Amino acid sequence: MTQALQALIDQAWEDRTSLSPKSAPADIREAVANVIGQLDAGTLRVAEKQGKDWIVNQWVKKAVLLSFRLEDNAPMSAGGFAQFYDKVPTKFANWSGDDFAKAGFRVVPPAVARRGSFIAKNAVLMPSYVNIGAYVDEGTMVDTWATVGSCAQIGKNVHLSGGVGIGGVLEPLQANPVIIEDNCFIGARSEVVEGVIVEENSVISMGVYLGQSTKIYDRETGEIHYGRVPAGSVVVAGNLPSKDGKYSLYCAVIVKKVDAQTRAKTSLNDLLRGD
């Protein structure tokens, strides 16, 4: 079933310029709807960790992108307090109290999640936004005005602080989703975009900006990473001097490494303030 579904999505992607809400064949519509439904239920993911590596299911991402070609904009309501005009319905549009109780997470108004996103048990959505294809795992807090971009993968027991931006894959088009692994803390107003991976047990301080071109400087070793924050890193915003010493450019600085036990026993303030 999955192989046949993947083959149909891959072919539809090749023919995407010819697809529209009026012209798309029924089998393609059904295939895309199937994928979006599985993403919504958490039975299918855009990216999965296999061993130490993350594997991106590109065909699933293609289905998300195709879904925008297959639907017209339509009026929709959210909680009865506002009207919207969009191609993707909200995740909770037709949910009952029993549906929320079974799902086992909290949604604080006016948080919005799009259909095709998955929210696991014991997660909390403060007034925030979770886009289509995103996966938010158990025990994670998405704090006020934080944004989880399309297809982003957020691990267990993560805290996305107020105003955090987790980039998506739709606009601008990205090859791989942003991944925040288990037990990470992302400080207020920080941005993680362009498929950057923040590995488990890491702490990102307030106001840190991470993209594929951002230098991530380890002050203990002098090593520079791109696109990946190593596990257990404590990261703050910083600058590195130019070779001629005339100017400096923004970077992120790994000020220390901590293991899971230290991370659990030490307050965030102590981690960020300590030498």
UniProtKB/Swiss-Prot annotation:
Major localization listed first in the record, in broad terms: cytoplasm
EC number: 2.3.1.117
Catalysis: reaction(s): (S)-2,3,4,5-tetrahydrodipicolinate + succinyl-CoA + H2O = (S)-2-succinylamino-6-oxoheptanedioate + CoA
Gene Ontology cellular-component terms listed: cytoplasm
GO BP annotation list: diaminopimelate biosynthetic process; lysine biosynthetic process via diaminopimelate
Record flagged with keyword Disulfide bond: no
Intracellular or extracellular location(s): Cytoplasm
Family the UniProt entry places it in: Belongs to the transferase hexapeptide repeat family.
Subunit structure: Homotrimer.
NCBIfam families on file: dapD, PRK11830.1
Name recorded for this polypeptide: 2,3,4,5-tetrahydropyridine-2,6-dicarboxylate N-succinyltransferase
Native source species: Cupriavidus pinatubonensis (strain JMP 134 / LMG 1197)
